[in-house]
C-alpha cells in the first residue's frame, strides 16, 4: 500500500515518546543508561516521523555499540551503524502508517486543506463546499460506516494509532481556521466595497447613471433631447445630485422661482425653447416628467434649467439663500411673501410680488426653518438698519438683543459680524461710488444718503441677487459669487 506521494509530505503528530525527544534535542541521548530510556505516556505534538525513526535507530545503535560489556561505545561506530539502518527502519514506519485503517481519512482531510488554501472562494464557483469543514463531518460519518463493516479503527500498535488520531485532529483544526480566515476576508471585502460606494465621488455616480440611461427617450424630438443632454453634461435629472447635501435643502421651491425668471443663473440652450405647458396625454411627456421631475413646477409648467457647471449652480443657490436669509427672515422660507417679512423688519420694501405669493402655499411644506428663529432675525435686521452709521452693537446692546431674540450673545455677535461685512459694506461702497451726493455731510454721507440707501434697499427686495436684473440696476453691487454663505 505504498504511496510515494506522501513519502515526504506527511508529518506525524504525537507519535513519539520521551526517548524520541531526547534523540532529537540531546546529542548524548544514545549514551544514557537503559533505565532512563523508558517510554512515558506523553506524546509530543511537534515530533516528526523522521525524528521518530532517528530515535528508534538511535536506540538500536546504543545496544549494538554497547556489545556485552555494558559500556557506551565510541561515537563513530554508532554513526556508521545508523547510516546503514535508517532506510530499513524508515520503510517499516512508513508501511505502518500507510497500512493503518485511518490513513484514507488522513489523506482526505489533507487534500481538503490543500483545496481550501488554493481554491478561490467565489459564490458562483461550482463545488466550493467540497473543502468545507461540514463536508468533512459527512465524510467521517460515511467513512465510519464503511470501515466498521471491514476492520477496526485501531491496530495493535497504540503509538501509531495515537499518531493517526492526533494528525487528523490537527488537520481538522487547520481546516476550521482556514474557513474562519476566508470568512473574515469576505466580510472585510464586503464592508470595504460598501464604504467605497458610500464615499465615491458624485461625478462617478452620475457617469455610472449616464451609462445605464436608455439611449432613446422617445420618437422624433426625443432623439434630439437625448443628443442635447449628452453634449451639455448638465441634465436636469442629475443636477440635484451634483449639489452637496447642504445646498440641496432649497431644492424643490427656490429652484422653480429661478427657473421661471428668464436667464436667472442659467444659460440659454437648444432646450430652453419648450412649450409653456406639458400635455399630460402625451406618453412621451409623461416619460420625460418621470425622468426629470425637477424640470416641472408645482402647477405643471415646463421649466428647463441649464447651468454651465455645477459650481454655477451652487453659487446661484447660495445667493438665493443669502437673499432669503437677509431680506425674507430665514434661508429656507424663500417662498413667503416679501411684504409681511419686510414690515416685520421695519424696512420699507413695498409689496411682495404676486409670483411669490402664489408659490407660498406650495413651498411651505417643502421648506425647513433656518438656524435662527424668524422673529429673532427680524429684530436683528431692524436694529441693523436703524444703526447704519455704526452697525455694531455695544456689549449692553448685545445683551439686550440677546434677551429680546432669545439667542446667545455669541450668536448675536456672529450675526452682526457677518451682516456688517455682507450687507452694510456693499451698501456703503455703493453709496460712495454713486454720483448722487453733491454736498457731503459730516459723517461722509450726503444729506440724502440714508434715503438713497433705503430706497435702493427697497428695490433690492424685489428680486434675488442671482437675478441679472439685480446687477443691471446696481452695477457696483457684488456679484452672486460674493455670497458664499448665508447669514
Curated annotation (Swiss-Prot):
Q: Cross-referenced PANTHER family, in alphabetical order? A: HOMEOBOX PROTEIN TRANSCRIPTION FACTORS
Highest taxon above the source species: Eukaryota
Q: Which residues bind DNA?
A: 365-427
Please name the GO terms of the biological process aspect recorded for this protein, alphabetically: animal organ morphogenesis; brain development; compound eye development; compound eye photoreceptor fate commitment; embryonic pattern specification; eye development; haltere morphogenesis; head morphogenesis
Q: Per the UniProt entry, what species is this protein from, by scientific name?
A: Drosophila melanogaster
GO CC terms: cytoplasm; cytosol; nucleoplasm; nucleus; protein-DNA complex; RNA polymerase II transcription regulator complex; transcription regulator complex
Q: Give the keywords, sorted.
A: Developmental protein, DNA-binding, Homeobox, Nucleus
Q: How does it assemble?
A: Interacts with exd; required for nuclear translocation of exd.
Q: Does the keyword Lyase apply?
A: no
Task: Output the SMART domains linked to this UniProt entry.
Answer: HOX (SM00389)
- This protein's major location comes to nucleus
Q: What happens when the gene is disrupted?
A: Severe head defects, including a failure of head involution and transformation of the thoracic and abdominal segments into a more posterior identity.
Cell location: Nucleus
Which intervals carry biased composition (Polar residues)?
Answer: 227-237, 333-345
Q: What does this protein do?
A: All isoforms are required for patterning of the embryonic cuticle. Acts with exd to delimit the eye field and prevent inappropriate eye development. Isoforms that carry the homeodomain are required for proper localization of chordotonal organs within the peripheral nervous system and antennal identity; required to activate antennal-specific genes, such as sal and to repress the leg-like expression of dac. Necessary for the nuclear localization of the essential HOX cofactor, extradenticle (exd).
Q: Which residues form the MEIS N-terminal domain?
A: 127-211
Name this polypeptide is given: Homeobox protein homothorax
| Gene Ontology MF term list | cis-regulatory region sequence-specific DNA binding; DNA binding; DNA-binding transcription activator activity, RNA polymerase II-specific; DNA-binding transcription factor activity; DNA-binding transcription factor activity, RNA polymerase II-specific; DNA-binding transcription factor binding; protein heterodimerization activity; transcription coactivator binding
